[in-house]
């Protein structure tokens, strides 16, 4: 069987046609998988052969149909910054969207759902409520101290509203425009990590964006904890602080070093 790979308008991709993704200087592309230990989805194997049939088609031959159709989460490096409102997309369920565009509505929808204990923030004894809303609050405070979040759906307008507050200041909840980009950039990462299905793949680009070094280390720690809880986390990063956060999480929590893979390009 042959299956078409969509190169554009999926997961934020705009790759053009197959001519644009061919390796220059190579007449033949051969993809081989040797001693594969990283599983993408449980109970699925994916031996693949790439066949370039012409400059406009890319085909996959093998057992890869629907490989990313379920239990796959992806956050682009160019996530949405501060917004007062986000449109409610009724077609999207349990996904923040490629750019985090569904984050506010999703958070409001799942706020009372329970979080698996392995993913709960437990570094401080008084932060033990295991709902998604509270766990988002705890982890956000760990990465960007003092931030409180309020969300609401305005259903007749089909929009979701978010307001933010700095707990140390007596200002009340304000527009996200009054705060830095780091909050809006990291919130979909936290929410996705907490709701991702066990065994699913979570791919996130540049989780360090708009965070100071300590925050970068802490988001690395968070993602490592989500991996230890059963989510397969794939990170693209330029930050040594993110990597150090992963190392700290592994050291403190007895993570098997063989479960961590760092590739330098």
Where are these regions (language model features)?
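Phosphate-coordinating catalytic segments in nucleotide- and nucleic-acid-processing enzymes
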Residues: 2-188, 192, 197-198
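Switch/communication elements of ASCE P-loop NTPase nucleotide-binding domains
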Residues: 1-6, 146-148, 152-265
